[in-house]
């Protein structure tokens, strides 16, 4: 039989502001938290279950902490934003740590709140919808300032971490698997994406219609469509990333004044595909054994060398380094007639 549910709401209501509600292992119903308090479970045996209806846990006051428990069974209506945990705009300075979220529409949705911390959570999205748009994102930040999303493990669902209309956010040290886009920025400025690890997604990191983004020391592997998708990205720095074994390592479209520096781009079908972009600096990157190193489409202007940093390393470079300075003496023009043909006639790519 089904284990009897313990009503969580009366326990919340009986907890004073500033106190900690300690939940032993057991099966609890969903609740709304409307005052500043902490809820601490005993690990995954402390289960808060929405039984497939609505949002499971709603945070509606500042300085709430949720830790060491499992949240499961929200409703599945993503158009109604049904989520495992909903962080309301009134819930500034929320902390959600070491929480498992599964079998939900969205995992954690932060809506217009400031300074949330989401750390060391394990979020398993669904994978049972006929179309991906019927699935929710693992962590969803909408109109959020100064979020820290750190060291979470996210799999399945639509996008792993989705950030829109948000500023000052740090997305660091997360691991995302088997989602559509692992990390997806839309209309989000002044954010950092550092030291994340993505694998087996359609796109590893997607930065769209955004500016002043720093993307550093990430590892992106097995992007079925793109490793990194940069579209209408402005004045951003992409440095020290490893992008491997994807269809395109980088897909670069409509981008201006961005710097790609010291990235390791290897074993992709195409190292970098560039279209309709200008005034971007690509320097000190290593292009290693991509089937096509570079494909141009449309008009693009790329500065390939930047003063003291030197040029880029190409594994297929043919030339001499007579003066022994480690930089080839003959300019390498990677966009040869073959990649021109590939861009114009995709079937050429054999």
Regions inferred by a protein language model and the residue ranges of each:
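Right-handed parallel beta-helix/beta-solenoid
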Residues: 1-14, 316
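Extracellular beta-strand-rich solenoid/capping regions of secreted or surface-exposed proteins
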Residues: 9, 13-16, 28-40, 47-92, ...
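Small-residue (G/S/T/A) turn/hinge positions that recur once per unit in extracellular repeat modules
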Residues: 35, 46, 61-64, 91-92, ...
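Extracellular beta-strand/beta-solenoid scaffold signature
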Residues: 50-58, 79-88, 103-110, 131-143, ...
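Functionally critical loop-and-helix segments that line ligand-binding/catalytic clefts
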Residues: 226, 236-237, 242-244, 251-253, ...
């Amino acid at each position: 039989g089904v284990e009897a549910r313990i009503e969580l709401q009366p326990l919340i209501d009986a907890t004073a502001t500033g106190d900690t509600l300690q939940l032993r292992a057991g099966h609890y119903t969903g609740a709304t938290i409307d005052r500043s308090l902490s809820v601490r479970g005993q690990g995954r045996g402390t289960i808060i279950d929405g039984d497939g209806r609505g949002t499971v846990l709603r945070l509606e006051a500042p300085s709430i902490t949720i830790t060491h428990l499992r949240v499961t069974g929200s409703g599945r209506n993503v158009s109604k934003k049904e989520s495992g945990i909903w962080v309301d705009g009134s819930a500034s300075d929320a902390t959600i740590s070491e929480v498992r979220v599964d079998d939900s529409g969205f995992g954690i949705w932060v809506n217009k709140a400031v300074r949330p911390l989401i750390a060391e959570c394990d979020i398993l999205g669904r994978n049972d919808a006929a179309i991906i748009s019927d699935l929710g994102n693992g962590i969803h930040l909408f109109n959020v300032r100064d979020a820290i999303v750190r060291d979470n493990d996210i799999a399945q669902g639509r996008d792993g971490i989705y950030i829109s209309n948000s500023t000052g956010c740090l997305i660091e040290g997360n691991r995302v698997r088997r989602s559509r886009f692992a990390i997806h920025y839309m209309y989000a400025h002044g954010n950092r994406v550092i030291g994340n690890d993505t694998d087996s997604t359609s796109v590893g990191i997607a930065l769209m219609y955004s500016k002043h983004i720093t993307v550093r020391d990430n590892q992106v592997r097995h992007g079925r469509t793109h490793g990194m998708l940069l579209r209408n990205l402005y004045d951003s720095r992409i440095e020290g990333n490893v992008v491997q074994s994807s269809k395109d390592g980088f897909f670069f479209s409509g981008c201006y004044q961005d710097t790609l520096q010291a990235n390791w781009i290897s074993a992709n079908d195409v190292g970098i595909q560039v279209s309709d972009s200008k005034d971007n600096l690509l320097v000190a990157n290593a292009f290693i054994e991509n089937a096509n190193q570079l494909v141009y489409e449309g008009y693009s202007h790329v500065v390939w060398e930047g003063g003291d940093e030197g040029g880029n390393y190409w594994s297929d470079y043919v030339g001499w380094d007579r003066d022994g300075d480690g930089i080839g003496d003959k300019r390498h023009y990677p966009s040869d007639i073959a990649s021109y043909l590939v861009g114009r006639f995709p079937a050429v790519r054999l």
